[in-house]
Amino acid sequence: MSALSSIDFSGFQRQGFQRLEACISQSQLNVLRQVAQAFHVNWERDNLDFYQSRAVNSAYLTAPDYLDNTQRELLFQFIGSQLIKDVISPLFADCCGFLNTQLFFNPVNPDQRNYWHRDCQYHLSLAQQQAALTGPLGLHLRLALYDEPGLEFIPGSHKRWDTEMQLDVRLSQAGHTPSDELPGGMLVPLQAGDMLLFDANMIHRGLYGMDRLALDILFCDPVPELLQFAREDCLPDTRTLESLVWPDAFTVTANMLKNCGNN
C-alpha cells in the first residue's frame, strides 16, 4: 500500500473532482518532468503549425512516436504503480481500463482564451451527453509537473445537466462564448506534485499561465464506447506488463481491443 491507500474519496463522489496534495517525491517528479519535456519537444517539431496556432494539449505519450523505449518504460512503471492503483481503484466498482495519456501546456498565443466544456461534447449529441451523466465513468488523473493555476469546475455537474446559461456558454449560443465567466465555478490551483482527479463529463476548463505542464492519465469503466478511443500501440509489451505492480488497467484495455478487433 502507498500513503494514499486510505484516502476518503467522498469529495470526488459529491463534487466530481478532488485534489490530492504532494503525492510523489521530488526525484520521481524530476524523472516525469524529463520524460514529458522530451515528448513535448519531439511532438512540437511534428505539429508546429497546430502548436503555434491553437494547441493546449497533446496526447498518446506512451506510444512509440516521440519517446524511446526507456522513456516509455518510465511512464508505464508510474501508471502501473501501487500509488496509482491506490488512487484509482476505489473510484471504480469493479475494474477499469487505461484509456490514454495527455500533456497540457500553455497556448503560444497569450491572448488565447480558455473554454468551458464537457469532454463528451466532442463526440456525443446533446441527448447522449445528458445520458452520459448516468453512464460509465471516464476519469482524469492529472499530475501537475510544475506549479500552475489549475482548473475551474462547476461542482456537481458530473451528475447534473447544464443550466441554460451553462449550456449557452459551452456551446457558444445566445451571444455567449466558452470563455465567459460562469457563476458557481470553483478554482483548484495545483502545486508541483499534486494530483487532481476529475470526472471527464463534468463542466470544467483549464486555466492558462505560470509554467503549466500537466500529465493527465485517463482511466474508464471497461466498456467499448469508451475504450474504442484507446490505442494498442500505447500499451506496454508483455515483458513490461509482467514487471508492473498494477498491470490490471492495461490488461483490461488490451483484452477489450482484442475482442473488438481494434488495432
Predicted regions and their residues:
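Double-stranded beta-helix
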Residues: 10, 134, 138, 144-203
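A structural signal for short, well-ordered beta-strand segments
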Residues: 101-103, 141-143, 215-219
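Short edge-strand/loop segments of extracellular domains
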Residues: 106, 158-161, 219-225
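Non-heme Fe(II)-dependent double-stranded beta-helix
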Residues: 2-14, 21-127
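A short secondary-structure junction signal
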Residues: 111-118, 125-128, 150-157, 162-166, ...
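Active-site glycine-rich loop that binds ribose-phosphate moieties when present
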Residues: 120-129, 173-175, 181
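Short, charged/polar surface micro-motifs in flexible loops or helix N-caps
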Residues: 108-111, 121, 146-148, 195, ...
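Non-heme Fe(II)/2-oxoglutarate
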Residues: 7, 48, 195, 201-263
